[in-house]
Amino acid sequence: MEKINLCEGVVAQMMDTEAWGNVSGDFPFSEAQLEKYADKLDWKEVSGNTNIFWSVQMLEKFKRRIDWTALSCSLQEENVSAELLEKFKDNWNWEEISDNRCLTPELIDQFADYINWKALINNWSCCEKLATEEFIRKYSDRIPACDFKDSRLWREMVEKKEKEIKKQICLC
């Protein structure tokens, strides 16, 4: 059996790097802690960390370090505001934001030009609240017709219609 010759310094450095990566992904860092340990952190992991409450000030301070795609995927509903989306609208990955549960009807209205509509109509967490004829009428010019019938939104609307029909049958 071949022995691997690892010097202590290399092993310690590898362990340190991996441990910091793990901590980066789940520790609820404050702004001060992010600043203090900025050079040790794995910023892709930090960006995907759902235990960090990102303020506009924090995003501004760390915007060059943040992995915006990872943050767009992991953004929490309680963390999202129109101000936050507006301030960094050119940084967000809008396809990921459109597939995120953080979007409210008000945010959809405000950022309709940035939304990836194919992703939105397949967003499991949004479709139940969006599955209305009013929504379809309002955004008919934005919803991609070629993707609509195969979307989660379509299935949600058909399920609602099925329930209406069954209820109607039972009342007769």
Where are these regions (language model features)?
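Alpha-helical scaffold segments
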Residues: M1-C172
